[in-house]
UniProtKB/Swiss-Prot annotation:
Enzyme class: ligase
Swiss-Prot/TrEMBL catalytic activity: 7-carboxy-7-deazaguanine + NH4(+) + ATP = 7-cyano-7-deazaguanine + ADP + phosphate + H2O + H(+)
Documented EC number(s): 6.3.4.20
GO MF entry, a single one: zinc ion binding
Residues that, per the record, bind ATP: L7, S8, G9, G10, M11, D12, S13, T14, T15, L16, L17
Keywords from the named record: ATP-binding, Ligase, Metal-binding, Nucleotide-binding, Queuosine biosynthesis, Zinc
Pfam families reported in the protein's UniProt record: QueC
Residues at which Zn(2+) binds: C183, C191, C194, C197
Cofactor list: Zn(2+)
Name the UniProt record assigns to this protein: 7-cyano-7-deazaguanine synthase
Origin species: Caldicellulosiruptor saccharolyticus (strain ATCC 43494 / DSM 8903 / Tp8T 6331)
UniProt-listed CDD domains: QueC-like
Source lineage: Bacteria, Bacillati, Bacillota, Bacillota incertae sedis, Caldicellulosiruptorales
């Protein structure tokens, strides 16, 4: 059975890739250049795909940045720091991004005659990202089933899980988290201050494991959250 995984190069989608491959699917991946300020995540996505020996398609839709302004796409907008629950984090929402990604990924899945399409929405994204919520996932499932003669089933198996739960799954699967990138900034090291860094650091702290990537700031990995 064939499956396509939408792969950003971050923790969640990388864990999902390992998970899907471990289930025995003939696995393909798709990533997107959507005009984001940096594409460092995709560099790591490529490395992971090479490691796992899975095909990796990168689709350039850079024009999307002009249609969907966000702190992740506009050089004049600063990336906010703090927690996802902070109101300022709404600046990082790229309008309708996942609907666009999933629509294109569905076309790719159909071309491959794949039966499944996976993406890594999870519970930690719900407060700020509308297109990661369970209601959105269910609506997209129905739409994808109606869009073509070939049946492609959308799966978001982590939609009710917290990031630390996904991390536990990944560690059991042997995910190499040094080959993942979460930071909204594209520096040599992760900033440790933006929303995704904050959430990532908390996940590792909660399960008592040190993150293998480097940060610009010193992190107390023994601190409990």
């Amino acid at each position: 059975m064939r499956a396509v995984v939408v792969l950003s190069g971050g923790m969640d989608s990388t864990t999902l890739l390992y998970d899907v491959k471990n289930q025995g699917y003939e696995t393909y991946t798709i990533s997107f250049l959507y005009g984001q300020k940096h594409s460092k995540e995709l560099e790591f996505a490529k490395k992971t795909c090479e490691l796992l020996k899975v095909p990796h398609k990168i689709v350039d839709i850079s024009f999307f940045a002009d249609l969907a302004p966000s702190a992740l796409t506009k050089s004049s907008w600063s990336v906010p720091e703090g927690y996802y629950t902070d109101e300022s984090m709404k600046q990082t929402v790229v309008p309708n991004r996942n609907m666009v990604f999933l629509s294109l990924a569905t076309s790719y899945a159909i071309s491959l005659k794949a039966q499944k399409l996976f993406y890594g929405a999870h519970a930690g994204d719900h407060p700020i990202y509308p297109d990661c919520r369970k209601e959105f996932v269910e609506a997209m499932k129905r739409s994808i089933l109606l869009c073509d003669y070939q049946i492609v089933e959308l799966e978001a198996p982590y939609v009710d899980l917290k990031k630390e739960d996904i991390l536990k799954i990944g560690l059991k699967l042997g995910v190499d988290y040094s080959l993942t990138w979460s930071c909204y900034k594209g520096g040599e090291k992760a900033c440790g201050r933006c929303g995704t860094c904050t959430e990532r650091i908390e996940a590792f702290r909660k399960i008592g494991v040190k993150d293998p990537i480097e940060y610009e700031i010193e992190i107390d990995w023994d601190q409990k959250t």
